[in-house]
């Protein structure tokens, strides 16, 4: 079982979140994790994993163009990602910066692929968020999210 974490990060905040989510995935035995910047990720890699988590900074209330391009390219695999586990996370410059709309724009693409999305009954309903550099709360959210993603991968695979 493997989870791929794909992200775009200009300042390093989203990258740090990706690494923290990977830390959470590693808590679950028999689930591997790979963390890659979107610029170094081929869309075909989505076919070879059981879980995908995508992270983006918030630009104008939505995902970065680099993430959008990656998701647009994934259309050629429509129907082939169904049943895989998906998730999203985001960082922004300020508290009203659009983290939830960014996450929802990513999740929309994953749901259209028929992926199973991991939510939370805690405060980070749609996925972890960070305002600026991840604080302790955001760090814990990321680690817990990664663990929940890995546990869901085991359940559905």
Feature roles, as predicted:
Residues 3, 13-16, 20-157:
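FMN-binding flavodoxin-like domain, especially the glycine-rich phosphate-binding loop
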Residues 8-12:
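Short polar catalytic/cofactor-binding loops
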């Amino acid at each position: 079982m493997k989870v791929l974490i794909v992200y775009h990060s200009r300042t390093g905040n989203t990258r740090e979140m990706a690494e923290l989510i990977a830390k959470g995935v590693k808590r679950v035995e028999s689930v591997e994790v790979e963390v890659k910047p979107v610029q170094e990720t081929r869309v075909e890699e989505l076919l070879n994993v059981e879980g995908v988590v995508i992270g983006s900074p918030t630009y104008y209330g939505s995902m970065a163009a680099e993430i959008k391009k990656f998701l647009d390219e994934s259309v050629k695999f429509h129907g082939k990602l169904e049943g895989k586990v998906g998730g999203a996370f985001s960082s922004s410059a300020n508290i009203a910066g659009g983290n939830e709309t960014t996450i929802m724009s990513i999740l929309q693409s994953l749901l259209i692929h028929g992926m199973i999305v991991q939510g939370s009954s805690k405060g980070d309903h749609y996925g972890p968020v960070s305002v600026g550099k991840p604080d302790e709360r955001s760090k814990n959210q990321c680690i817990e999210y990664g663990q929940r993603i890995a546990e869901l991968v085991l359940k559905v695979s």
